[in-house]
Amino acid sequence: MTHLPKPRALLGTLAFFVPLMLPTIPAASQDKAATPEKVPVADDVPSAQELSVWIMTYYQRPEPDKFGQRVRQLSARGMLKGNRPEFFTMFLGRVMHAHPERIAGWMEAWKDLPADELEILRNGIWNSQTDAGKQWLRDHKYAELADKPAPPLIAGGPMVLEPYHLDLMWEWFFATGAKEPVLLIVDKFPLNPQDPGDDELPPVPNRQGVDRPTFLRATIGRTAVWSAASLAARHDKLLEHLRAIRTDPRLPPRGKLWLDRVIQIAERDREKNAKT
């Protein structure tokens, strides 16, 4: 059987995923200056690998008190540079969604970051879909972004699926540990054109002689399977969600077969890792 590739960059965001309870911050709309969170930039900034682990395990140990500082550390390490559409905005947005009262203070503390990084942070605010976030955007002359329709992944609206959307789904899970993004990922398993066979993973899609939609569907299906299997070997919460989803009678036959394969790979790798 073909062995599962070791964790690596999925498509975009995961490229850097190497294997504060403050008082409510008054909104600027209340004619009060937002209270900036005091965010020291440590001389000894954690390594890119350490920050990647922090992102991937944030849901296990949420750190709203340190979130502002961590974002500055990501900036210092060059890890807030977007390399695909909607880069990092889902992770930011889901953390901000959990702490809307802090958005104004965080943004005040981040105001000296580079313009391209501030744009990512503003898009994170939009992704939070919170009243406090929308108000901050309006107060700072970004009303058009504030009034933009909610992200389809969050709102459940129609969308043209692209490979980078898997990155957004994983960002969502890393930020929250929620089941919903895992359901969205499992929903992509049936995009694989074949049921599981002798090889462990779906075949690498062949671009030649295939139209773009067909190629993208196969690429998304394969990436969904191997990323889920790889991550479930190390994330208890993810494996727990996958096992729960496995009992859903509405799963399409091909999706169920690939889910069985993902769970099998994850359990095998866990057992192997326990022996080493």
Indicate residue ranges for each PLM-predicted region.
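Bacterial N-terminal signal peptides
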Residues: G12-P23
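Bacterial N-terminal signal peptides that target proteins for export
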Residues: T2-L14
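Signal peptide processing junction and immediate N-terminal pro/mature segment
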Residues: M21-A33
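Juxtamembrane helix-loop transition sites at the ends of transmembrane segments
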Residues: M1-T2, I120
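Non-catalytic all-alpha helical scaffold/repeat segments
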Residues: Q30-T276
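N-terminal non-cleavable signal-anchor helices
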Residues: P19, P26, P40-A42
